[in-house]
Each structure stands twice: as C-alpha cells, then as structure tokens.
C-alpha cells in the first residue's frame, strides 16, 4: 500500500533530501555539494537513458548551467564524490575561451555536461563568446542606449542560451538590456529555427510600461533579412492607467494599420473589473459579483452567462455557501441551466441540465470515486425518443494509475468517450509515471523528453506527431505525418521535418502562429488577428470567454452577434460535446487541445 500510494522522502545527515519516491514513479535521486547546492538529479527515465541532470551555480548561488551528463554512476558514488567539494563556478568571459561557455570548469561534471540552459548575469561579456546574440538596437521613441557597466545590471539576468530538447545543438540566444533604474528596456531573441523577436519597452515614473514595441522576423519570407533591422511585422501596444495604477486603456497598432483602442477598462469601488469596452468602444462587456467577490454574471457581445452559489437560485438548485458553483446558465447553450451536486469532500458527483421553463434535459452525468479521489465510474445519459446511456464507464487502477477503462455502452457520438475493451491492459506508463500507451485512443507509443513533455506520439494507424520543446518548456513547433502500412516508426529518430513522411508543421514564436509555413494568427490580449483569409488581409477577432476561461465564441468589428462554430461546447463536467477547430487549439480553458 505504501509503495502504491505513499510519498516517501529520505534524508542525509545534513537533512537534505537525497531520495524521493512518488506513487507510480521510480525513485528520484539527489546529490549535493559541500555548499548544499543541488548538483545532480536522476529520475527513473534518466536512469534508463544512462544520464544525470546537472546543475551548476556561481559563487552567489545563482544557477548558471543546467544540462545532463551521459554517465550512469551509482547514486552512492556521486554522493561520495561531491559531498566535500565546493562545485561553484564563476564567469571568466572570452579570456577563458569557449570552454564551458565562459565559466570555469572546476570538476569533471563541468567537462562532461551537455548544457540545455546557460544563464549570464551582471554584464554582457558573453557576447564575445557567441556570435548568435543580437546586440542593442535603436528605435525612435525608445531607449537609445543601455547601461552595460552600471550597477543597474548587477544581479540581473543579462543573457540566456536555451537549447532545443529535440536537438540540443539548436538554441535560442536571448539578451536582456536594462536602464539606469534596472528596468528591462529591450530584449532580443535569435531563435533555434531562425525566427527573430525584439521587444522594446518605455516606462512611466512609477515603473509601469506605457508602450511596448514587438518586432518579428519570419523564417518563411522570400529572401533572407538584409540585417537585424529588417523585420516582417511590428506590433505596438500603448497603455494608460487610472489614479490607482490600474490599466484603463490599451491601444494596439499592427504593422501599418491604424491605431485601435483594443479595450477600455472600468472598475468598481473595490477594484474589480466592472465594464470593458472593446474595439474603439464599439462593444461592451460587463461583469457582476456578489458580496464575497465571486463572479455572478458575464455579459459579452452575444453571450450572457449567470453563475449561482446561494442566492437567486433557479428552481431545483441547491444553495452552496463554500464557493462551489451551484449552477450556471449560458445563452450560447440555449440558456440551459447546469446544476451541480458535490459530496462532503467537494467532489462533483452529479450534474443535471434544465430548460428555462424548468423541465429537465436528459443529459445527466453521475460520478463515483475511491478513497484517493480517483474516478471509478462515469455514467452519462442522452435523450433519443427515450433516455439512453451514452457512457457507462468503469475504471480500474493500479495505485493511482488507470490500467483499464471499460464502457458497457458505445455511442456513435464523436465525444462519447468510447472505450473498446480490446485487451486486458489498455494503458501503460514509464518510470516517471508518464502515459506511454493508450490503446483506447489508438496511441501505440509516446516518447518523452528530459522534462517529461511528450516528444513523439505514434498511433497504431501509422499517424505520427512530433513536438519540439525548448529546455525552458516552451513549445515551438509540431510536425505531423502518416507512415504507410509496414513502415517502422523510429521514435528516437523523428526529430526534424526533413523526414519524407512528415506532411506538415506548425510553429509558435511568441505571439505568432504559423501553419504549414504561412502566418495564420497573431495573438493580442483580447483576441487574435486572423490571417486565414488572405483576401481580406489581417482581421481582428475578439473572443468571449466563460467563467473558466474557455472561449465560447468570437466577433469581428461590425458584428452584432457572436460567431461560435470554431469554439467548444461541453457538458457541465467539462467533457466536450463537439469538435474543436484545429486552427484554435487553445480555446478550451487556455490549454492546447489536439484531436
């Protein structure tokens, strides 16, 4: 029982955690130096790969290098080697050469390490080691210089080298520049795939940004950029604040388009957002709260949502006083009211939906749990002349990990959570507890990177997805393709889009999203600029969000109603009721959804 459900921690004589065991995972080992700095770490997947994660610090205790070493020494050996040594390093710059990237290697760990993130502080001498960094740029209306030798950059992060986990030889080179008050006034990035992003910032005397200029250079242009000043797109924001320092107006300019008042914000007496006027004040959104500050009503263009707790409840709703939502209604869902019931541990045990006249819609959901809070059963009903089960799902666990899910009813509905009972064990996990096989979803294998993010997903029908992450966790690209029958799918080798079976790629570079080599979307705080219809040019699209942050629709300047077809609708439990448009994958609670 302890091995299945327990969280186990082991400590050395100096009360440092040297081993940790989590449910469903192999142990994680930790190694420290004499100064109590964590210098090595190894989880279950690291052991299988024969590597240790390495952490190197300067003499001020700042982490300067994180990477891995391909040497699978036993845990006890590394403890013995490191525990009496001070393994801190310091920056010597170009005078020390490019060895260890300007830092002094003081131990075999430094020599063996393949770096994934390199941090530079205090000064800009690192630019003499790497030619890929972009220096300080001058733009009219923004700072024309930075303070390289001033005390203002002391203890500041001035540069970063961030590796692409799929191929650590490809890296982002990011530089940060500061003014005399230590405020970041400019950052430049030369990305692993060749994109370039520059950000320029002006501040008021209180330290709040009043204007931000973002420049972007694409890798999909017809000719290479002539210089670092040759950019493709410019996105400029201007900010105004009220007497309390709250954002009151947000202006935006995209390329050569006219400046637009994206949003005007108004607040109530206690500082809560009360009204929002968008796109040159042509559309109004209002927000209401109860005496506890909980949101009770959201009014957007073409969407009204009401949230109930313990007051003004519709019929058949049970009042709740602990912050749980008793029910809510949304005009996009035909003003149906969704009501919730919870157990004594605040777990959702049932949902019911009602029409405005109080009659029940036959889409109830029921849930049961085990003592650990794991979902054991899920029943869902729909009405087709008479009530029928859409799902009657039973889930079996080993510890807290799903091993098998069986559904007694199989519906043709797209999101009916179909669980074909194909084999005795549908789901498998790796040594870190990551899902590596799910036969219910035709997932044959998933390969993960060093930070436990999926790198390759292979499906049993020959389809393949490859994800590209930077070492700091940013997703920058995905590639997709289909392998013909009989073709071996090499999970460890599919790391670039030169593979003959890769049919397309998508790129993310900060605010810019590219699909198959074409700029498709530019995000901004209240929506996005759509470029799918090139005949119309850039098209502003504002989004309407519900109480959980999911996008329920969008509207364009001149619209009087909400377009909702690309965006998700879902059951009260959150299970989707329709497909999500692949061009808007982040519509569901801000999380990426792929199908």
Predicted feature residues:
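Repeat-solenoid scaffold signature
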Residues: 23-110, 242-299, 330-384, 442-483
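Surface-exposed acidic, glycine/proline-enriched linker/cap segments
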Residues: 1-4, 77-113, 310-327, 403-424, ...
């Amino acid at each position: 029982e302890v091995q299945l459900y327990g969280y186990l921690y082991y400590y050395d004589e100096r009360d440092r955690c040297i081993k940790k065991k989590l449910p469903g995972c192999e142990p994680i080992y930790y190694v420290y130096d004499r100064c109590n700095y964590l210098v090595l770490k190894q989880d279950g997947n690291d052991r299988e790969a024969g590597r240790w994660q390495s952490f190197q610090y300067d003499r001020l205790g700042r982490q300067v290098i994180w990477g891995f070493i391909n040497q699978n020494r036993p845990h006890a050996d590394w403890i013995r080697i490191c525990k009496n040594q001070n393994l801190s390093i310091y920056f010597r710059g170009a005078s020390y050469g490019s060895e260890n990237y300007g830092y002094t290697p003081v131990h075999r760990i430094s020599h063996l390490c393949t770096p994934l993130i390199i941090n530079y502080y205090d000064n800009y001498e690192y630019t003499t080691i790497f030619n890929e960094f972009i220096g300080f740029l001058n733009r009219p209306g923004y700072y024309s210089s930075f303070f390289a030798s001033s005390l203002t950059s002391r203890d500041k992060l001035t540069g970063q080298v961030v590796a692409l986990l799929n191929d650590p030889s490809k890296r982002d080179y990011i530089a940060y520049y500061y003014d005399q008050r230590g405020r970041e006034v400019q950052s430049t990035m030369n990305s692993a795939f060749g994109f370039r992003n520059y950000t320029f910032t002006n501040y008021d005397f209180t330290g709040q940004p009043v204007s931000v200029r973002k420049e972007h250079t694409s890798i999909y242009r017809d000719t290479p950029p002539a210089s670092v000043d040759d950019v493709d797109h410019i996105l400029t924001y201007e900010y105004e604040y009220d007497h309390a320092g709250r954002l009151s107006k947000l202006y935006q300019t995209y390329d050569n388009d006219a400046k637009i008042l994206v949003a005007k914000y108004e607040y109530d007496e206690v500082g809560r957002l009360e009204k929002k006027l968008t796109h040159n004040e042509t559309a109004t959104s209002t927000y209401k709260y109860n005496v506890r500050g909980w949101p009770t009503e959201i009014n957007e263009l073409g969407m009204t949502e009401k949230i109930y707790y313990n007051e003004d409840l519709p019929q058949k709703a049970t009042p709740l006083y602990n912050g749980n939502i008793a029910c809510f209604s949304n005009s996009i869902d035909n003003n149906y009211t969704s009501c919730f019931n919870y157990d004594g541990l605040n777990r959702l045990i049932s949902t019911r939906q009602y029409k405005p006249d109080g009659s029940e819609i036959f889409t109830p959901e029921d849930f049961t749990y085990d003592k650990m809070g794991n979902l054991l059963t899920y029943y869902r009903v729909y009405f087709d002349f008479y009530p029928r089960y859409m799902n009657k799902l039973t889930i079996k666990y080993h510890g807290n990990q799903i091993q098998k899910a069986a559904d007694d009813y199989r519906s043709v509905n797209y999101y009916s959570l179909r669980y074909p009972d194909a084999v005795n064990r549908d789901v498998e996990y790796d040594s870190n507890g990551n899902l590596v096989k799910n036969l219910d979803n035709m997932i044959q294998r998933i390969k993960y990177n060093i930070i436990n993010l999926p790198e390759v997903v292979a499906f049993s029908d020959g389809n393949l997805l490859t994800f590209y992450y930077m070492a700091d966790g940013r997703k920058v690209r995905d590639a997709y393709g289909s392998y013909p029958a009989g073709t071996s799918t090499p999970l460890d080798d599919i790391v670039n889009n030169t593979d003959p079976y890769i049919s397309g790629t998508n790129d993310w570079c900060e605010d810019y999203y590219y699909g198959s080599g074409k700029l498709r979307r530019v995000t901004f705080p209240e929506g996005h600029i759509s470029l799918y219809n090139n005949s119309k040019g850039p098209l502003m699209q504002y989004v309407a969000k519900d109480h959980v942050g999911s996008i329920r629709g969008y509207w364009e300047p001149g619209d009087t109603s909400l377009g909702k077809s690309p965006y998700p609708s879902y059951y009260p439990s959150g299970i989707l009721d329709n497909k999500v448009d692949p061009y808007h994958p982040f519509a569901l609670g801000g999380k990426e959804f792929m199908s």
